[in-house]
Amino acid sequence: MQNAIAAVGGVLALLLGLAWPAAGWATEGALGRQITGTNVQPNAGIVSPEPIWAVNFAEIYMDGSIGGSREVPIGGRTSLGLDAKVAFTLATVLKTWDTGPGRWNFASSFTLPYVWTKVNSTVTGPGGRSVGQSDTASNLFDLYFSPIIAGYHFSETSHMALSFNVWAPTGKYNANDMANPSLNNWTFIPQVAYTKIFPESGFQLDTVAGIQFYTRNNATDYRNAPLFSMDVMGRKMFSNGVSAGLILGTIQQLGNDSGPTADRLNGFKGRDWALGPIVTYDRKLADKRSLSLGLRWVPTISSTNRLDSSSTVMATATLVF
């Protein structure tokens, strides 16, 4: 069970490729499916060699903006700048399958997300005047599932996990609204995670990288270009179950968005970087169960055509049994 405990963050790292509601977002609405710095989890590359169930609850809050000098694609039109607040709650269930001893282990997962979002924008009204608008949405978000998560153990201190993750457009969407509890597209994310443990120093390195492929939003005729994302986390573990470290993350757009609005904005290509601290706590419970808690703050340190946030906070709680 000790190995199962260590693997909790690993499989959940593959589950929490977090998506965000459309204020349309480089990328329609200026965000996309993942928030920089929130994807990597402790033990990211480890899939448990023991059959387990894991239940995870995650809460993320973000308050971001793009300056008013930039046009942002949103809901089939453009806004001069954008301010968005998002509170995201995710409940995830994961099953690691009993595949017996060996270097490979496998898991599957399902996530039910709920979102609250408020968007403020400035659009061009009649006569060319700028008009401020505000919109709020609160509902179930697009469903997220990982049909296959494959973990490979190079050694007791070196692990890798491969996954194929899917966001389905199950949330409500209205192209006339600025805030929507859906991106109104399918998103496919192949992802690789790696964990390296240094037992002598109590240091651990975790990294997660993936590429997001989007289908077209047929309601706005907008298609996001593929996005490359990578988060790296280094932590120092202590004997009392507490760890502390830093996270560095980036999202880089690999091409231009397409569609009439994107073409007018020259593809609206974007990128960003985030850097911030993380604190975690792991505790063994009775009957081979375990509890893992985490709290991070990952503010944006550089951003182009993506929401810039100094208030991105994520809290997680995971029970393994």
Regions found by a protein language model. Give the residues of each.
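Transmembrane beta-strands of outer-membrane beta-barrel proteins
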Residues: W53-F57, W104-L112, S158-F164, F188, ...
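Residues that define the transmembrane beta-barrel architecture of outer-membrane proteins
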Residues: P51, D83-A91, S134-Y144, S182-F188, ...
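Outer membrane beta-barrel transmembrane domains
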Residues: A30, G68, I74-G76, A219-F321
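Outer-membrane pore/translocation modules
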Residues: W104-A107, P113-R223, F268
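Residues on the lipid-exposed face of transmembrane beta-strands in outer-membrane beta-barrel proteins
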Residues: A44-I46, F57, L90-K95, F145-G151, ...
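Short loop/turn motifs that connect adjacent beta-strands in outer-membrane beta-barrel proteins
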Residues: W25-E28, N43-I52, G64-I66, W97-A107, ...
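Surface-exposed strand-loop-strand hairpins of Gram-negative outer-membrane beta-barrel proteins
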Residues: E28-Q34, Y61-F88, V123-D135, M178
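Transmembrane beta-strands of outer-membrane beta-barrel pores
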Residues: E59-S65, L112-K118, G151, V166-K172, ...
